Regions:
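PRPP-dependent phosphoribosyltransferase catalytic core
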Residues: 97-159
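Short, well-ordered alpha-helices that flank and scaffold nucleotide-derived cofactor binding pockets
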Residues: 17, 40, 44, 97, ...
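Active-site-facing substrate-recognition patch
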Residues: 1-25
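Conserved glycine-rich SAM-binding loop
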Residues: 34
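Short, glycine/charge-rich flexible loops or terminal/linker lids adjacent to PRPP-binding catalytic cores
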Residues: 44-80, 88-97
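Glycine-rich phosphate-binding loop signature in dinucleotide/nucleotide-binding domains
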Residues: 21-24, 73-75, 102-103
Length: 159
């Protein structure tokens, strides 16, 4: 499922509304890289502080690894942990453990797209399709923006 910028904006607005109806975070913590983008948008809409932490998967299917932990400023605060998608929950589980070690007052999770069995506290959209986000669509090769080769067949096949 190819997601354009306008639809992504609507997804972030919907996510912020869902969160605001049930939770009042003091800080929104985005999981870098992809969760930072919806995290910043949600934090801005909710008028809350924003921070980030970084996890990575060295290879597709590998377990995530911590690159940079959450800031100490989450201690004693209500935290909303944001990522862009959630399938297995491996990334959110690792992030939750890292944040919990800093003794926040409360942690809840939010994702733009729920794509699998793991259920975050909040999600804006649910699908079983692969999500192609606008910032993942193109890369630079030489001095040109080109369609990311591993996604070309998905985009061309959907037209």
């Amino acid at each position: 499922m190819e997601v354009g910028w306008p639809f992504f904006g609507e997804v972030c607005r919907a996510l912020a509304l869902k969160v605001s109806r049930e939770y009042d975070p003091e800080v929104v913590l985005g999981i870098a890289k992809p969760g930072v983008i919806p995290g910043v948008v949600v934090a801005s809409i909710l008028q809350r502080d924003f921070a980030s932490m970084a996890l990575t998967r060295r290879e597709p299917g590998a377990l995530p690894q911590l690159v940079a932990g959450p800031p100490a400023s989450v201690r004693g605060r209500r935290v909303l942990l944001v990522d862009e998608t959630c399938n297995s929950g491996d990334t959110l589980k690792l992030a939750l453990n890292e944040v919990a070690a800093l003794n926040p007052k409360e942690i809840r999770t939010a994702v733009s797209f729920r794509t699998g069995p793991y259920e975050p506290d909040f999600y804006a959209f649910e699908t079983d399709k692969l999500i192609l986000l606008p910032w993942d669509r193109e890369i630079i090769e030489g001095d040109q923006l080109v369609l990311r080769p591993e996604y070309a067949h998905l985009i061309e096949g959907s037209r």
